[in-house]
Amino acid sequence: MEKRELYELKDNKIVRKRRFCPRCGPGVFLAEHEDRFSCGRCGYTEFKRKN
């Protein structure tokens, strides 16, 4: 996936579609899986809550 695919334009503002990794910081996005978010760079993982 290219970096430009991770942003969209809304009302003349650039909006991120994905969250940044809290460990790696801005510029490194978390991959969204069915049950978790994960960072491919550092291995950080957050599991989604089941409601």
Swiss-Prot record:
Which is one Pfam family of this protein?
Ribosomal_S27
Which Gene Ontology molecular function entries are recorded, alphabetically? structural constituent of ribosome; zinc ion binding
Query: What is the free-text note on the cofactor?
Result: Binds 1 zinc ion per subunit.
Q: Mind telling me what this protein is named? A: Small ribosomal subunit protein eS31
Which GO cellular component terms, listed alphabetically, does the Swiss-Prot or TrEMBL entry include?
ribonucleoprotein complex; ribosome
Is-annotated flag, keyword NAD?
A: no
Alphabetized, the UniProt keywords read:
Metal-binding, Ribonucleoprotein, Ribosomal protein, Zinc, Zinc-finger
* Subunit structure, as described in the record: Part of the 30S ribosomal subunit.
Q: Which NCBIfam families match?
A: PRK00432.1
Classification via InterPro entries: Ribosomal_eS31, Ribosomal_eS31_arc, Ribosomal_zn-bd
Family label: Belongs to the eukaryotic ribosomal protein eS31 family.
Query: What cofactor does its activity depend on?
Result: Zn(2+)
A biological-process GO annotation: translation
Q: Which gene encodes it?
A: rps27ae
Q: Does the keyword Transcription regulation apply?
A: no
Residues binding Zn(2+), per UniProt: 21, 24, 39, 42
Q: Which SUPFAM superfamilies match?
A: Zn-binding ribosomal proteins
